[in-house]
Amino acid sequence: MDLETINVEKIEKVAIIKLNRPELLNAVNEQLVWDFQKATESVKNDESIRVVIITGSGRGFSAGADLSERKASWKGSKDALMRGYKPFFENITSMPKPVIGAIAGPAAGIGAAIAMSCDLRVMSDDSYILSVFSNIAL
């Protein structure tokens, strides 16, 4: 599977989905949303996979949304939620196999939501989950 912002690795019966924008602490942009949907759909439909691990590349799980993105194709917030984020999270929560969040470093904003959507979270000593939505009036 050729994805720009996600790496998918299969080790025996385990699929590892890795957010791969380490230079931006795996900040979630539109491309990552589409790539994540493809990756989770593929893993969901692969009957040989028994467990899914979601993690981040580099020194963080995810710093949250990429607020610097200017050229998204969303037609407003409702479109982003309905076409992008709703299926993004439904693919995690409806996964017919256990989903483990392997969290190193920050999981903030949308990264925190990804972590909390997993069935189980395993965190390093320096990890933290930060819900920043109230700080930005969401």
Which residue stretches match the model-derived regions?
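Conserved CoA-thioester-binding segment of acyl-CoA-metabolizing enzymes
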Residues: 1-57, 90
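Hydrophobic/aromatic residues within transmembrane alpha-helices
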Residues: 17, 54, 66, 114-115
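Hydrophobic alpha-helical membrane-association signature
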Residues: 32-36, 84, 114
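Glycine- (often His-adjacent) and acidic-residue-rich active-site loop
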Residues: 56-91, 107
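CoA-thioester-processing core
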Residues: 88-94, 102, 108-138
